Amino acid sequence: MGTQSIATYRRRFAGVMWRDLQPMRVREGVVECLHPLPWLAASWAFAAWQIWPLAAGASFMLFLTALRLNHEAIHGNLGFRGKAHRWVLHGLSAMMLGSNTAVAFQHLRHHRYLGTPEDIEGACGRMTFWQVLREGPRFPLQMHADAWHRGGPVVRRRMAIDLALNALMVGVALLTMAPFLLYHVGVMLIAQCLTGLFAVWI
């Protein structure tokens, strides 16, 4: 996407009345935080019962609702005060098995550096469908590595919390060998490889 295309894009959408990121009351923010939980419970239940198609469908919805909630938390839009938005990101990191602190860092840079080489998150938006799929496993690793490198001590400290929560989730799954937890770890790792497709490209 060249400079001309970026300018055209911004001009074309400058007058659009976007309906996302509407300011929320605290009660609405709490409800928003609850949206992924029924899908988490359903995916674990179906995995425990070995009904894999339904488990996969519930996991798909879990990841999509978690991505939506993550976006609201990144922009501080849930109506909470203090550090609450950050703790939402930490909780989602434990559930989604990635660092949402890193995602937040890259997403805010995406808004600032749209369409430039600094826009790592937006790079997938300039690829073909097959390129995005091929890039999938590398995309979250690149997002995390760059955030760790550029983010400074505060971002690295918050990323360390996220990654410790990831390790805890994986550790519990391996120690208990609970089928639904092992399934969750596997399906979330696959979902992380598809974030470039669902969160950026589509």
Locate predicted features.
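Post-HEXXH active-site segment of zinc metalloproteases
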Residues: 79-95, 125-126
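Non-catalytic, topology-defining segments of multipass membrane proteins
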Residues: 1-60, 93-197
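Acidic (Asp/Glu-rich) catalytic motifs at the cytosolic membrane interface
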Residues: 65-82, 103-118, 202
